[in-house]
Amino acid sequence: TDPKEFAHGVEAAALMRQFGCDRDVKSVDECVAIEPALASCRDKLAGGIFTLSDESGDAQRFTTELARMAEGKGVTFRWNMAVESLTFDGDKVTGVRCVNEEHRKEVLAADAYVMALGSYSPFLLKPLGVPCLIYPAKGYSATIAIDGHRGAPMVSLTDLAWKIVFTRLGDRLRVAGTAELSGYSKDLNLVRCEALVRRTFELFPDAGDRESAQFWTGLRPATPSNVPLVGATRYRNLYLDTGHGTLGWTMACGSGRALADLMAGRKPG
């Protein structure tokens, strides 16, 4: 919706095509043909970048199902455990100090350890002297019941001007975005919440039941370069898989597979 942002998007699309990514520049009419819901904001559009291979889904459902499948393969999950610190001896981590759900302390020992605590990773790594430049960037989402309304988009969309995304999840519309630097607080800023809803109905007046909006906030583990920290550390049995920023689910399976290869002594790929 912003000509300058669209121009930047066109430049970024050209760069990504050089690396094999599918990014097609589309006119306003072409955008509306791909997603008819955009007809309600046609006069606000500058153009679009379309990726046929893009997909979207429900990250919570994916994670829940993945855990269920992992349990079926013999993985044991220890829920409601508070992790206090890592123990180490020389260049080797020797255990994880925890408090279990019965409030009893215990130390879990393993052959290898993976630090995958997102924004909270620095708290355990700092005492070990492992560099970990991660800061929490709070993001917001609003989930709106479509409830028979016909104006919600079917195609996943990104508003480059406002840095928010629209994703249809069955009979719900998920709107997410913003970046708030407020430490580890997960309190909802109602001004930001309302901004998401207001922008949604500016673009898609018949998107759903405005009063049904449910809000959520989470902490994105951001690094200065926006590149995640995946790989070995100075400790021979401690590995990192953290700092994925806004692309945690996008990169989850790929970085997990790459790290598994590294831990097994194989070349990732």
Predicted regions and their residues:
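Short, conserved active-site loop motifs that form the nucleotide-linked donor/cofactor pocket
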Residues: 74-76, 173, 238
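Dinucleotide-binding Rossmann-like beta1-alpha1 core, especially the glycine-rich loop
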Residues: 1-28, 200
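General small-molecule cofactor/ligand-binding pocket signal
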Residues: 24-26, 76-78, 213
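Active-site substrate-recognition segment that forms the wall
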Residues: 39, 83-93, 107-236
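Mid-domain beta-loop-alpha active-site segment that forms a flexible
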Residues: 50-67, 119-120, 192-199, 255
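Helical element adjacent to the flavin cofactor pocket in flavoenzyme catalytic cores
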Residues: 7-15, 39-111
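Alpha-helix/helix-capping structural signal
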Residues: 4, 29, 119-120, 254
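C-terminal lid/capping helical subdomain adjacent to the catalytic/cofactor pocket in oxidative enzymes
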Residues: 25, 38, 88-90, 146, ...
